[in-house]
């Protein structure tokens, strides 16, 4: 039986910092996902017909955001089952399949029977915007695949102990979110379209940023 190892105060502090440094970027991803509806609402509230646009924004994300968060849990899966060799795409295929299955949940709410009951009766959405609500939640079906793929690449970066790479992805998420809203709002685009576009663009920016940094030469990339 192995004896318990005694650590010095300095070793404990170093280990604690390493654990914090490892988990913070991953936790930040979930935090930004939860915070993004509020950030986007500041722009949607300044669009035409803002009352209706905000109603569409919040009522659809009430369904889409929890499912997207579930898809982002691909992070620990990627940490545990990271690629075993260059070109190993098994986890990528699994992430896409898992995201597609999760995407069936918001898709179901876009169907007339479920959508009319949930949004029209349960959430009391006005009839004038009911069709737009169902269209928006149908588009959000694809966000699950995007977040699952994002979670995979972030998990791989974490498994390689590249926290700065993961953090760069979170920065890309925030920049993508703000830039999309800043560009679309002055163009007079409907608020719900701004929201849907921003929520899709932001995780795509994260995925591209993390993937690009992981593929930089080690002499260029710092972890």
Annotate each language-model stretch with its function:
Residues 17-22, 41-65, 87, 127-134, ...:
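Interfacial/gating helices of multi-pass transporter permease domains
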Residues 1-33, 216-223:
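Interhelical loop/hinge segments that connect adjacent transmembrane helices in multipass membrane
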Residues 92-141:
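C-terminal transmembrane helical hairpin of 12-TM major facilitator-type secondary transporters
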Residues 62-67, 126-153:
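Alpha-helical transmembrane segments of multi-pass membrane proteins
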Residues 35-44, 78:
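Hydrophobic/aromatic end-of-helix segments at the C-terminal termini of transmembrane alpha-helices
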Residues 1, 52, 111, 115-116, ...:
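Membrane-interface helix-loop junctions in multi-pass transport and translocation proteins
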Residues 23, 30, 58-61, 95-99, ...:
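Residue-level recognition of transmembrane alpha-helices
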Residues 56-109, 150-161, 165:
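Small-residue-rich hydrophobic transmembrane alpha-helices
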């Amino acid at each position: 039986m192995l004896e318990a190892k005694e650590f010095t105060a300095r070793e404990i502090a170093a280990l604690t910092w390493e654990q914090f440094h490892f988990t913070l970027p991953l936790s930040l991803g979930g935090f930004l996902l939860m915070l993004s509806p509020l950030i986007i609402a500041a722009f949607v509230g300044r669009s035409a017909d803002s009352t209706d646009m905000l109603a569409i924004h919040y009522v659809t994300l009430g369904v889409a955001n929890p499912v997207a968060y579930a898809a982002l849990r691909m992070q620990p899966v990627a940490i545990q089952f990271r690629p075993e060799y260059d070109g190993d795409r098994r986890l990528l295929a699994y992430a896409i399949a898992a995201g597609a299955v999760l995407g069936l949940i918001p898709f179901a709410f876009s169907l007339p029977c479920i959508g009319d009951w949930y949004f029209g009766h349960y959430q009391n959405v006005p009839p004038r915007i009911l069709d737009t609500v169902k269209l928006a939640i149908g588009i959000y079906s694809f966000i699950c695949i995007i977040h699952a793929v994002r979670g995979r690449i972030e998990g791989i970066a974490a498994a390689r102990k590249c926290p700065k790479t993961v953090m760069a992805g979170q920065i890309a998420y925030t920049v993508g979110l703000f830039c999309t809203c800043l560009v679309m709002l002055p163009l007079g685009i409907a608020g719900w379209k701004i929201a849907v576009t921003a929520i899709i663009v932001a995780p795509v920016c994260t995925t591209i940023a993390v993937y690009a940094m992981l593929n930089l030469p080690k002499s260029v990339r710092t972890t």
